[in-house]
Amino acid sequence: MSRVEGLTSWYSDWQGLSAAILGIGVSGFAAADSLRELGVDVTVYAPEKHTRYNKLLDAIGARYVCAYLDELCEVDVDFIVVSPGISPDNPVIKRLRDRQIPILSEIELAWRVRDKVNTCPWILITGTNGKTTTALLTGSMLAKDGARVAVCGNIGTPVLDAVRNPKGFDYLVVELSSFQLSLLPMHGNGAVKGFSSACVNLDEDHLEWHGAKELYYCAKSRVYHGTTGFCVYNLDDEETKKMVEQACVARNVRAIGFGLCVPDVGQVGIVDGILCDRAFLSARKDSALEITSVEKLEKNKLSMRHIISDVLCAVALARSVETNPLSISRALDEFCLSPHRTEVVAKEMGVMWVNDSKATNPHAVIASLSNFSRVILIFGGLMKGVDVSGIFDRFYETIKAVVVIGKNQSFVGNIKCKKIVCIPDSNDPMSEAVAAADLLATPGDTVLLSPGGSSFDQFESYEHRGNCFINAVKDLVKRK
């Protein structure tokens, strides 16, 4: 066993070790900062110069080397920390492993040093869609109940920053992407063990990175591995149930289902418009605990089907750590969705304009379309190797027309729709898409930006894409 494998605490002997951090960003810097605080000699390798991080790395005493990944096969260090953008199947990573160099992720490192201030339960959340919303919902419920909670991970705040917070936390709600999960070990001291774990839903995504649907699903399933308290799964998504059934977990772990249906014992669901818990109350065999109503959720724009599913998942996770139902209800009354998630931008001349730019895969588009009856769909972007035909087969009667954006529109041949308008690449593709949608729309229609792909071919981010849509719609309304 290497010396690194035996390091299971902030207070272990890290002094004098050397580490290479591959990639820089918020998680890479958090790793560098933490390791320097532990007395580790740190060198950060990244292919581009990041002026902001260069100065920060200098300040903490870490070195920065501008280098590409394939230049690092012979790096000589005690261990390596990789960014979540680097595949564990990368040839360089494989070669480094062959040299017996331990390779950690920021999440594994955070797990090893989680006791710096205090050791608290981790609530792990993943899914193809809705994981950020579910994490924020769960965090808000725990906080409303008086707990000190950090929502961290893929959502943006590094887990290492949370575990080093001098005040400590009662819970960490950790959002995990498939990239982050694929880097986590299944065994040993670095294997993360959540108290409660959930996969919100599952569908094809990031196939260009994982290589196959099965490998993507396998990465997601790791969220349940080692769970010590509760595995929360989606009753409307059979794959998540299979994951729980196949997971290696601690003894006496309970499986809790959630879904848009009347709940059975051990489940969270809906009865006559009331969200109910039949999983965590002692009299669950013959009664249910009321949490809130769909009517109340509607007042806070949380009543779309896929959002209610996220709410139910968060309710299950919050109840798994004994959060008071009244606190959960109050948190839901105050919760606001993040922008670019089925966000109503305008209602003009009987047409509703909806920004769902966060929908970066077909599963998210399907979830969004399920809420509307007649849609002009603005669709396209970097499709990440997934098949889009299922969307248009399933919603042929719902989708009145498709306005296609994106530089590569080769997928258009897989679209089955009554009307297709392709927007050529330009300096302002979104304004052209909005103008085209306006010509197609009639009273009673919804114009829905739900692209189904990443934004980076024409926009800086999904937020930028969504803001371009919002601005184009506002300009259109002004002209009318």
From Swiss-Prot:
Name any one GO molecular function.
Answer: UDP-N-acetylmuramoylalanine-D-glutamate ligase activity
Pathway noted in the entry: Cell wall biogenesis; peptidoglycan biosynthesis
Keywords on record? ATP-binding, Cell cycle, Cell division, Cell shape, Cell wall biogenesis/degradation, Cytoplasm, Ligase, Nucleotide-binding, Peptidoglycan synthesis
Q: Where in the cell is it found?
A: Cytoplasm
InterPro entries (UniProt xref): Folylpolyglutamate_synth_CS, Mur-like_cat_sf, Mur_ligase_C, Mur_ligase_C_dom_sf, Mur_ligase_cen, MurD
Superkingdom assignment: Bacteria
Q: Which GO terms describe its cellular component?
A: cytoplasm
Q: What is its EC number?
A: 6.3.2.9
- What is one Gene Ontology biological process annotated in the Swiss-Prot or TrEMBL record? cell wall organization
Its catalytic activity? Answer: UDP-N-acetyl-alpha-D-muramoyl-L-alanine + D-glutamate + ATP = UDP-N-acetyl-alpha-D-muramoyl-L-alanyl-D-glutamate + ADP + phosphate + H(+)
Q: Report if keyword Cell wall biogenesis/degradation is assigned.
A: yes
What does this protein's UniProt record list under function? Cell wall formation. Catalyzes the addition of glutamate to the nucleotide precursor UDP-N-acetylmuramoyl-L-alanine (UMA).
| Family that this chain belongs to | Belongs to the MurCDEF family.
Q: What is this protein called?
A: UDP-N-acetylmuramoylalanine--D-glutamate ligase
Which species is the source of this protein? Tropheryma whipplei (strain Twist) (Whipple's bacillus)
